Amino acid sequence: SYNSGQPMQAACLLYNITGEQQYLNEAQQIARSAYSKWFTLYDSKELGEKFYRINGDHAWFYSVLFRGFLELYKIDGRRDYVTAFEKSMLQAWMSECRNQTTNLLSNNYFIGKTNSSWQVLHEGAFVEMLARLAVLELEGK
């Protein structure tokens, strides 16, 4: 996932700098491949809907992927990748994976397990993704 996010973000930045279509095409191809590989259709009882969600690996890897999807969204306006992240984060927050006392999110954020200890790197990644989503919301995007 992070191995897709970083080159996708780089391709977007190169497109912004050069305007060369090949970089945008590359970013879009990486996005399609990453989405196909790292997202799964999920039926959420918490949200009452089906959506494509992150497969549930370590959040830091997905935060890097999310950066790439955000850069691409700024260029092509395709929101389905961002929406998948948005719903994935909402699912994690609304489910049993969130510790109701501390609001920390479990490493197992789609299977509903809670932890007795947490990793700073993991929690930081969640904060980053949630903050980036909040900025989009404030901007009306």
Regions found by a protein language model. Give the residues of each.
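"A position-specific structural signal for the A-helix of alpha-solenoid helical repeats
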Residues: 10-13, 68
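CBM-like carbohydrate-recognition segments
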Residues: 22-141
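Structured, solvent-exposed acidic/aromatic patches
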Residues: 1-10, 59-63
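Inter-helical turn/loop segments and adjacent helix faces that build the functional surface
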Residues: 14-19
